[in-house]
């Protein structure tokens, strides 16, 4: 673990804090007349003031002689009886899923009061390897948003020995050790390959051993694991999880000492199901917090980030202060930085959010590291852009563009009915269902059935130009246009394409190659929407407002023109290719039974 310098102990900085609060030196900023949310105790202190010196808080509370902290250069902010709370912390996020670079994400996250995130860049790591992680870390430095890094633990997501997919890169124990020595690392990213953990796979355990040696936090990914299997997973030295989707599952994990992150992202929303964990139990702050995991640019722009999750919790009846604790001191204690963040109090970094109301959090003034980033909704800070190497902008390599007929599964029977293994998706859930449906066969082709919401799907290797392509069917997407193709296909991020019309599927794939990554929607041979994502085929290098407008244009077209009411459509499609979340997935090698970590046939004989 090599924390950024801002977390280091600076004697001169500490002297300034002491001299400021004892009245020997004027403060840089004084915020007066606020209702101070005390996250350690769950109280609200009215008519409080916050004294800031440099990057840190010299003191916070009631002061009878406030003038003794004020000099001629002190900025005095009247809090106007607003609520002051710590900057929000997201303990687990994949920034790439926002479709934004660290620079673009920081602008939006800070607007909504987030001042610290722990990012697991395994998306770019899968595409560009440890080199991609290093580039991401470099881009994340020198931003007012503190972006701490979890080193990807599962690149690829499954053991290559299983042969489940064509992967671009491998981040092994040696790469983990190299990355652990870089400034900004705090943890080992979610250990997704729980099958290998339960099988005592030494290559996975070696990464965990490296993490423990470097005192990195080890993060988990244990969907539906219970009983002895969960014990075995924890025995490996993995201490957190954000995959709980039912209350009993989350409670068991908490009882066994796991840190439970309650996930409320764009595609999967687990807060409502896990509410009893907050409302019916007195679980210690250290073992419970909110996390977003994956959040898209539309939600960031329109609904917010951690403030959005806090507000949803309040709407569900959670006490506002408790909800704030789960986005501040809770995650701070999990990442062992509670002496720096998560509290508005002496010695802590001056990460402060002001909101007029506590029943509905709407940040209007955000201070990060003692610097005013937003003041009454207006951006006061310039964000420097990062120049990405050319190698990161050209990552889509196909052997050829598949012909339309190649997207249709073939069998040796000319006509008839067959039973197919189909992936059924559910809005708002990361899980899929393995369902068996009867499909018609015509001229040796197994046909999709749009009337039952069963469409064609394929995943194509886009890293090594092998020509490898897996075919299948998806049920439940509600997609009525001709085709959609995207280079976001967790976690290997091969090219995934789905649709009702094989000709449109081929056209969409061709366009993806031309723009070198992104999202393309085609209907009746025409491109009706596209969003270029040049950076690793995952992120746009444009400003967040531009990305939002282009993304919104596609979603509006699908909603208004084709009746698509699936809020998390793009992310749900991307997850179809992730062979570590039950029950069944599709890769460039074919259908995967996740629990067995084996390929299965598309058609049952």
Swiss-Prot record:
InterPro entries reported for this sequence: Adenine_deam, Adenine_deam_C, Amidohydro-rel, Metal-dep_hydrolase_composite, Metal_Hydrolase
Keyword Translocase: no
Superkingdom in the source lineage: Archaea
Alphabetic keyword roster: Hydrolase, Manganese
Enzyme Commission number, as recorded: 3.5.4.2
GO-annotated biological processes: adenine catabolic process
Catalysed reactions, as listed in the record: adenine + H2O + H(+) = hypoxanthine + NH4(+)
Cofactor: Mn(2+)
Gene Ontology molecular function: adenine deaminase activity
Entry keyword annotation includes Hydrolase: yes
Family, as annotated: Belongs to the metallo-dependent hydrolases superfamily. Adenine deaminase family.
PANTHER family membership: ADENINE DEAMINASE (PTHR11113:SF2), N-ACETYLGLUCOSAMINE-6-PHOSPHATE DEACETYLASE (PTHR11113)
HAMAP family, per the entry: Adenine_deamin
Protein name (record): Adenine deaminase
UniProt source species: Staphylothermus marinus (strain ATCC 43588 / DSM 3639 / JCM 9404 / F1)
């Amino acid at each position: 673990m090599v924390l950024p310098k801002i977390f280091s102990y600076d004697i001169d900085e500490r002297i300034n804090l002491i001299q400021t609060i004892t009245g020997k030196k004027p403060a840089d900023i004084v915020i007066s007349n606020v209702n101070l949310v005390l996250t350690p105790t769950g109280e609200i202190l009215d008519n409080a003031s916050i004294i800031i010196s440099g990057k840190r808080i010299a003191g916070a509370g009631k002061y009878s002689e406030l003038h003794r902290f004020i000099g001629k250069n002190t900025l005095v902010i009247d809090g106007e009886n607003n609520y002051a709370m710590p900057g929000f912390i997201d303990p687990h996020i994949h920034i790439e899923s926002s479709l934004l670079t660290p620079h673009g994400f920081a602008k939006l996250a800070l607007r909504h009061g987030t001042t610290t995130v722990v990012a697991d860049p395994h998306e770019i790591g899968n595409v560009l390897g440890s080199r991609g992680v290093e580039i991401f870390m470099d881009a994340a430095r020198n931003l007012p948003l503190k972006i701490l890094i979890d080193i990807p633990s599962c690149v690829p997501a499954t053991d290559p020995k299983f042969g489940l997919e064509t992967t671009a890169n491998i981040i092994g124990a040696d790469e983990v050790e190299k990355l652990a020595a870089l400034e900004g690392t705090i943890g080992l990213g979610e250990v997704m390959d729980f099958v290998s953990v339960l099988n005592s796979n030494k290559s996975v355990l070696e990464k965990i051993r490296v993490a423990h040696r470097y005192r990195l936090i080890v993060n988990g990914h244990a969907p539906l694991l219970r009983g002895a299997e969960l014990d075995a997973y924890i025995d490996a030295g993995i201490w957190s999880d954000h995959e709980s989707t039912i209350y009993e599952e989350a409670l068991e994990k908490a009882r066994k000492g796991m840190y439970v992150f309650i996930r409320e992202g764009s595609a999967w929303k687990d807060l409502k199901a896990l509410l009893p964990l907050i409302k019916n139990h007195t679980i210690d702050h250290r073992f419970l917090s909110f996390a977003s995991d994956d959040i898209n640019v539309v939600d960031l722009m329109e609904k917010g980030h951690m403030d959005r999750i806090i507000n949803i919790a309040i709407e569900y009846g959670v006490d506002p202060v408790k909800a704030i604790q789960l986005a501040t001191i809770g995650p701070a204690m999990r990442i062992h930085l509670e002496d720096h963040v998560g509290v508005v109090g002496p010695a802590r970094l001056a990460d402060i959010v002001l909101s007029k109301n506590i029943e509905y959090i709407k940040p209007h003034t955000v201070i990060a590291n003692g610097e005013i980033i937003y003041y009454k909704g207006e951006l006061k800070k310039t964000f420097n852009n990062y120049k990405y190497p050319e190698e990161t902008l050209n990552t889509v390599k196909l052997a050829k563009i598949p012909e339309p007929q190649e997207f249709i599964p073939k069998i040796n029977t000319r006509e008839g009915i067959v039973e197919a293994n189909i992936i059924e998706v559910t809005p708002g859930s990361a899980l899929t269902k393995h369902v068996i449906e009867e499909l018609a066969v015509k001229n040796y082709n197994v046909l999709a059935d749009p009337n039952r919401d069963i469409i064609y799907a394929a995943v194509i290797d886009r890293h090594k130009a092998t020509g490898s392509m897996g075919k299948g069917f998806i049920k439940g997407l509600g997609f009525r246009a001709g085709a959609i193709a995207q280079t976001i296909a967790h976690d290997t991020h091969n090219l995934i394409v789905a649709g009702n019309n094989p000709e449109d599927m081929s056209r969409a794939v061709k366009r993806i190659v031309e723009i070198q990554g992104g999202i393309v929607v085609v209907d009746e041979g025409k491109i009706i929407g596209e969003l270029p994502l040049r950076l690793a085929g995952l992120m746009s290098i444009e400003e967040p407002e531009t990305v939002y407008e282009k993304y919104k244009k596609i979603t509006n077209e699908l909603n208004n023109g084709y009746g698509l009411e699936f809020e998390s459509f793009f992310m749900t499609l991307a997850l179809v290719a992730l062979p570590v979340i039950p029950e069944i997935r599709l890769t460039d090698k074919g259908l995967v039974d996740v629990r067995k970590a084996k390929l299965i046939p598309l058609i049952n004989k």
